[in-house]
Design a protein with these regions (language model features):
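Structured beta-strand-rich core segments of catalytic domains in phosphoester-bond hydrolases
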Residues: 1-91, 99
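Generic beta-strand/beta-sheet core signal
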Residues: 18, 95-97, 153, 215
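Metal-dependent phosphoester-hydrolase catalytic domains
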Residues: 24-45, 52-54, 75, 84-85, ...
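Short, structured coil/loop segments at alpha-helix boundaries
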Residues: 70, 105-107, 163
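Active-site His/acidic residue clusters
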Residues: 92-113
Length: 262
């Protein structure tokens, strides 16, 4: 039908909206973990999409997915990764994901619920006591080790403020005790893109902080951070001026220094 809603994740062809990681540091390929095939119903207390009744209540509503669909459906709409990278003798876990946007659905809120649980999967993975249910694409139970250095990266499709903010979603990560969200990346271009007082933190031209680079509190000092979104007066604005130039999202960067393990 020209639409990708009949796939595990939206796409008009296999691999659309795929993920890639480029690193100037060596990647520990043998220890990469992926969670693409983790079944949504295997998450404890998942946010099951329910079609509301005529009154708007979901108490007696019908599940959006039938039994066969729900049993087969993956949680990850693209993939979830734990990629260990070796930096100066230390291991840094790149925790990457691209959850589905929380819209393009109906009153059952299937994409909103999936976005919440995709983010929850990564939040639970940070805490072995909460993530004991998680298995990788080899079917092995896995968790992040205590005092691991990590950086969460990706288009999380979850705003932290404004009219696109859904309370309690991105906070699963930004307010997680192991995650450092103290420095919020900003840009001059974002500041001029909207009248909102917080628009300097936007990472997408449609007005939201949707893309994140969140380091662990353990193991790093944060030197600086920003969003590559030049102001219209900059010579570099040509790189982001429209969709013909580049993405509707902006590059988010952070400068980190390794600290001692103790």
């Amino acid at each position: 039908e020209g639409f990708g809603g009949d796939a595990y994740g939206f796409g008009l062809y296999p691999g659309q909206y795929g993920m890639a990681l480029l690193s100037k540091y060596p990647i520990d390929v043998d220890d990469i973990l992926t969670f693409q095939t983790f079944k949504w119903h295997h998450m404890p207390h998942p946010q099951v999409p329910i079609i509301p009744d005529e009154s708007g209540s979901t108490d007696k509503g019908k599940p959006w997915y039938d039994v066969e669909e729900w049993a087969a459906l993956r949680l990850s709409s693209k993939s979830h990764w734990d990629v260990p990278v070796k930096v100066a003798g230390k291991t840094v876990h790149i925790l990457a994901m691209h959850p589905t946007p929380p819209n393009f659905d109906g009153s059952e809120d299937r994409n909103g619920k999936r976005n919440f649980d995709e983010i929850r999967l990564m939040a639970d993975y940070l805490s072995p006591d909460k993530g004991a249910y998680i298995y990788d694409d080899n079917g092995e139970k896995v968790s992040l080790s205590e005092n691991a250095r990590f950086v969460l990266v990706g288009d999380f499709n979850a705003a932290d403020i404004g009219d696109k903010h859904r309370e309690g979603v991105i906070e699963q990560l930004t307010e997680h005790p192991l995650v450092n969200n103290d420095i919020i990346p900003t840009s001059a271009g974002g500041a001029g893109a909207s009248g909102a007082e917080f628009s300097n933190r936007f990472t997408a031209y449609w007005g939201a902080r949707a893309d994140y680079v969140l380091p662990s509190r353990f193991g790093f000092d944060v030197n600086d951070a920003g969003v590559f979104w030049p102001a219209k007066t900059s010579d570099l604005y040509r790189l982001v001026k429209d969709r013909e130039a580049s993405s509707d999202h902006r590059l988010v960067w952070i400068s980190l220094s390794l600290t001692e393990d103790n």
